[in-house]
Amino acid sequence: MPAGGGRWGSFWEQRTRQLQSQVRAKEDKIAELETENAVLLLKLAEYKGKIEKSRSEATRISTLYNKQQRLQRNTRSALSQLDGVIQKLNQDIQAFHSSSRALLRDYQDEYQDRVSAIVTAVQRTRQSAETLLACQAKVVHLEQALQDVSARHQLERQRRKALHNSLVELRGNIRVHCRIRPLLPFDSESDDPVLQSSSISREVAHAVDDETVLVKCDRPGHPLINKTYHFERVYGPAESQSAVFGDVCPLLTSLLDGYNVCVMAYGQTGSGKSYTMLGPHSDDGPVLPLDPQSDLGIIPRAAEELFRLISENPSRSPKVEVSIVEVYNNDIFDLLAKDTVAAVSGVKREVMTAKDGRTEVALLASEAVGSASKLMELVRGGLQLRAKHPTLVHADSSRSHLIITVTLTTAACSDSTADQACSATHPGEQTEAGRAGRSRRTSQGASAPQPVPGDPAGRAEQVQARLQLVDLAGSECIGVSGVTGSALRETACINRSLAALADVLGALSEHRSHIPYRNSRLTHLLQDCLGGDAKLLVILCISPSQRHLAQTLQGLGFGIRARQVQRGPARKRPPSSQMEGKRRPD
């Protein structure tokens, strides 16, 4: 079976080769499929990546879509709200347009009205400007005319005042100046409920000008009455002490020219008499004024001015002596008298009538002074002894009349040339000095005179002139001052002496045959200056308050009576030799 076996062997070999080729074909197919599978796997991986990307993109797109949906919803809501706002704005715009049109119409109407008003105003302004120009021209003309009239008025006032002063000199009238003090805190103080409820501190006295006082008399149960008083000079509440002294100063020149001078302060208590005469109250007393604007009164200013005037003419330097008295309870006390131990103490004195008819105080102490400071030192010493007592009206009320006398003893002119020089200052007064009927002073009490060549008696002729500065105690209403006991007696004596002074002035003004000087020691002591040949100035001090209306009217009435006194012209003091020839026989 080799032959058979050979066929089977080739068959199997062929079959094997066939199977091997099929296997190789299958392997190639497998390789191809594996390759294709690998490619597919790659594509699958690629597709998976794409799918993953697609999913991510889808998720992103879904998220964006959701956001877009929300945004759309929000947008629709916002658009809906915006539509509402737009509608509201459209409505507001329409309303605004309507109101704007209405407002514009109103503004146009108002504009037309204003334009019309402006045109009218411009026309009126033009007319007013023309009128104003005419008025200005008229005002300029009137101002010029007023200045001319004022200048003429001032000139006429000066002429009238000069003529009035000349008339006062010729008639010998008492000069009366009125001073109105300011309102003070105590003017509104009162224990009376009726007075407290009324206007007691209302100002009723006014200085209309420098010569006129107006008093508004408004008393309960009476109609309002305005009373006017005229004086040589009126000082308002704002006028200073220097202004008051400015009108007193010329009298000091007259004193050095040989005239007797008296300055007297009169008024109710608390009206400013002591302030006017001395200055503000001080425990140290008045001093010399350091400047013209100080508050010091007439007495310290007069002391300084007197010695200033004396120093300007040292060739005729007079001897200056001072005496100080007070009239207290109708008794006269010498405030410069000294006791046994040389201490100053008030000593009671008496008034007497000298041989030449003048009044003087017996045994009156006087001291020579050489300066204003020495004079004021004596005044301060006298003031410390002056009687004072507090009242409801015045806490430092003076209870006595103070009289300071300054006596100047001067050598008389010895020849005709000197006589002419002496009379040059006051022309016409030498002739007047020869008239009779006036009391004269002698040189008693003066130092031993020096001889003058040609004097047969071997002594120099001397002239004495006297300056009296009087601070009267104030009149009081007992119900207002509230005084009791000894102060009540003081008030009674003060009021009686002031009433006696008013009686004397009334008798002098009426030219009565009898003048009651001796009704009071005050009037007896002041007889020479009241009815004699002294230049007398009364400073009437009044309160402006409604509370003191009655006393103010009383004081003004006193001043009017004083102005009516005509005593003849004042005269210079004659030399002592002429005085000797005119003395009455013992």
From Swiss-Prot:
The UniProt annotation places ATP binding at 267-274
Source organism superkingdom:
Eukaryota
Cellular component terms, GO, for this chain's entry? centrosome; cytoplasm; microtubule
List the residue ranges forming a coiled coil, or say none: 10-94
| Signal peptide positions (record) | none
Entry keyword annotation includes Cytoplasm: yes
Which InterPro entries does the record associate with it? Kinesin-like_fam (IPR027640), Kinesin_motor_CS (IPR019821), Kinesin_motor_dom (IPR001752), Kinesin_motor_dom_sf (IPR036961), P-loop_NTPase (IPR027417)
Annotated compartments: Cytoplasm, Cytoskeleton, Microtubule organizing center, Centrosome
Question: Which GO terms are recorded in the biological process aspect for this UniProt protein?
Answer: establishment of spindle orientation; microtubule-based movement; negative regulation of mitotic centrosome separation; nucleus localization; protein homotetramerization
A GO MF annotation of the entry reads: microtubule binding
User: Which keywords annotate this record?
Assistant: ATP-binding, Coiled coil, Cytoplasm, Cytoskeleton, Microtubule, Motor protein, Nucleotide-binding
Q: Domain Kinesin motor spans what residues?
A: 173-565
One Pfam match, given by its short name, reads Kinesin
Q: Where is this region: Disordered?
A: 417-460, 564-586
What does this protein do, in the record's words? Minus-end microtubule-dependent motor protein. Acts as a negative regulator of centrosome separation required to prevent premature centrosome separation during interphase. Required to maintain a centered nucleus to ensure that the spindle is stably oriented at the onset of mitosis. May also act as a negative regulator of amino acid starvation-induced autophagy.
Q: What does the record note on quaternary structure?
A: Homotetramer.
Q: Which PANTHER family match?
A: KINESIN FAMILY MEMBER 25 (PTHR47972:SF63), KINESIN-LIKE PROTEIN KLP-3 (PTHR47972)
Its family remark reads: Belongs to the TRAFAC class myosin-kinesin ATPase superfamily. Kinesin family.
Protein name (Swiss-Prot/TrEMBL): Kinesin-like protein KIF25
Q: Which organism is it from?
A: Macaca fascicularis (Crab-eating macaque)
